[in-house]
């Protein structure tokens, strides 16, 4: 079956973060090179802590973002929730993509955080705030993220999210192998 999407499809992104929006745009245009998309970011709550501190809380945040984006904007063909979190000494993100009939999910690669960053997290709002403090950056979470700092810009938040989003799109790029899983 072809991966082509013919008409303009609205992709509702449950974030206004430029790094997340860039990753979603990149993944969709890569997965569907003949597709035409309109990408719309919306500010919706994750209903979890600003800095989720477990895999399950992070996953729930991504699911909640999709649910809340659907409630906010009923006109989407796709809804994308991305939630970054920490579990132990690693950070990662969950990607959830839904249409009206399908859901795809994937977790990004994980990266270890320095001990001095981990030590400061209990008194911080989000990892990005601690990274800015420790590394002397400003608003890193909306740029390359912790991963760009720790890999000397070999990877960025958007590049790692791009890969995870491509994986979350598998049910949509291979619909003949994935029956509808939403009712």
Curated annotation (Swiss-Prot):
GO biological process: nucleotide metabolic process; thiamine metabolic process
Cofactor needs: Mg(2+); Mn(2+)
Catalyzed reaction equations: XTP + H2O = XDP + phosphate + H(+); ITP + H2O = IDP + phosphate + H(+)
EC number of the protein: 3.6.1.73
S-S bonds: none
Function noted in UniProt: Phosphatase that hydrolyzes non-canonical purine nucleotides such as XTP and ITP to their respective diphosphate derivatives. Probably excludes non-canonical purines from DNA/RNA precursor pool, thus preventing their incorporation into DNA/RNA and avoiding chromosomal lesions.
Protein name in the entry: Inosine/xanthosine triphosphatase
């Amino acid at each position: 079956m072809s991966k082509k999407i013919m008409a303009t499809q609205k992709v509702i992104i449950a974030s206004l973060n430029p790094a997340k929006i860039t990753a979603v745009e990149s993944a969709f245009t890569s997965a569907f090179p003949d597709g035409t998309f309109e990408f719309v970011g919306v500010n919706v709550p994750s209903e979890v802590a600003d800095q989720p501190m477990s895999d399950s809380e992070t996953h729930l945040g991504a699911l909640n973002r999709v649910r809340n984006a659907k409630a906010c904007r009923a006109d989407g063909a796709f809804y994308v929730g991305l939630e970054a979190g920490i579990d132990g000494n690693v950070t990662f993100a969950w990607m959830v993509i839904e249409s009206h009939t399908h859901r795809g999910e994937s977790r990004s690669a994980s990266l270890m955080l320095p001990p001095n960053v981990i030590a400061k997290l209990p008194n911080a709002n989000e990892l990005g705030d601690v990274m800015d403090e420790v590394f002397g950056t400003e608003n890193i979470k909306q740029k390359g993220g912790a991963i760009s700092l720790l890999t000397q810009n070999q990877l960025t938040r958007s590049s790692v999210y791009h890969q995870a989003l491509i994986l979350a799109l598998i049910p949509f790029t291979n619909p003949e192998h994935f029956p509808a899983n939403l009712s």
